[in-house]
Amino acid sequence: MLKRVFDIVFSAGWLVGFAPLLLVVAILVRLKLGSPVLFVQERPGLRARPFRMVKFRTMTDECGPDGELLPDEQRLTSFGRFLRATSLDEFPEMWNVLLGDMSVVGPRPVLLRYVSRYSPFQARRMEVKPGVTGWAQINGRSAIGWDEKFALDVWYVDHRTFWLDMRIVVMTFFKVLARSGAERAEGAEPLGEFRGDGK
């Protein structure tokens, strides 16, 4: 109950307080990357229930002569890299928190296709709502492998408290200021494809 109250107050305050910044970023995304401004993708939530996660776009839709999208590294602009490094692309996820699909703190939502590849241990990370930030994010982010990431997520599930959430929120701000480990492809995972068994 306390966690949900915190989620509502924090996300509502965030969206209102950062509304001018969100508007500026949205305008810049529209000018530099085109439309749509938001990137929307289904992700697994609590008990694997799909929800539509929203983020700011960070890549263009440029295609090659064959009509196929260019490789991610060619579509990612310096502006997109900046959004990722500062985590500004993730600010709209607070809307998901306000709706109740996500929490401020919890395991980061991965791709839907990964759910069937989880071991029973790894699947335990879905016993709580996914978060905007989490225990794994302040303990390595994309610098750790899938096994360690999922182990940290399950550790959080077993040890979660309101005060641990507060610690994670505070430490996240320091991580964002340091711009640590945020490079990734749009809609993809910073660790590469998860194929099961920690791979």
For each feature predicted by the language model, list its residue ranges.
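An acidic site on a long C-lobe helix of protein kinase domains
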Residues: M1-R4, G17, R75, S87-E93, ...
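Short, hydrophobic secondary-structure boundary micro-motifs
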Residues: V25, V40, G67-E68, V105-P107, ...
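Short, glycine-rich, amphipathic interfacial segments at transmembrane boundaries or analogous
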Residues: F39-R75, T133-A151
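A short, structured surface patch at a secondary-structure boundary
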Residues: D72-K129, V169-T172, V176
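Positions in alpha-helical segments
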Residues: F10-S11, F39, T77-R81, R113, ...
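A hydrophobic, helix-centered structural microdomain
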Residues: M1-D61, I168-K199
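C-terminal terminal-structure detector
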Residues: I8, M126-K199
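Residue-level recognition of specific faces of alpha-helices
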Residues: I27, V40, K55, R75-S78, ...
